[in-house]
Amino acid sequence: MNNILIYIGAAVILLALLATAAEVQRELHSFKVTHYHVTSRKLSGLNRPLTILFLSDLHNWRYGEKNERLLRAIENEHPDLILIGGDMLVGKEGTPYDTALDLIRRLPALCPVYYANGNHEQRMKEETEIYGDTYNIYKRKLEDSGVIFLENDARRIRMGQTGISINGLELPCSVYTKFQ
């Protein structure tokens, strides 16, 4: 009888571990589109609703071959602007950035794209003794495709009769510390 209880307990634990592993895999291979509706009197000069798409923290992840699933989802939103909040790549020595580059290069064909660095891009930018000129090459390739980088910078654009300020704040690596 005790052996049966041990086997049942082990089976329950094994099933729980398998279910957890399956959920982790599902989370890693899916993304969620969330819609927010913002209203403000300051936006009254818009002649139609504005769709702003925000991307961040993809960390070189690929959704389908050449990110086709993600790109289709972006296209289906018909964005007026795309804002990138950084960490599109992995800032670790020897880690290629091709996945992020290939996706982001395709976005300016849809609408204007504004990019602010996250801690991974910032690490590559600051730590040239490790990364060499990798950040500058990555940035130049994206700028050549039409991406606008905002590094402690702002751009003022007009949408309808409304002026909109898009700002990018660049934080030094020293700010990105783990909480203890």
What are these regions (language model features)?
Residues 39-44, 73-75, 167:
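Short beta-strand-to-loop junctions in surface cap/lid or active-site-entrance loops
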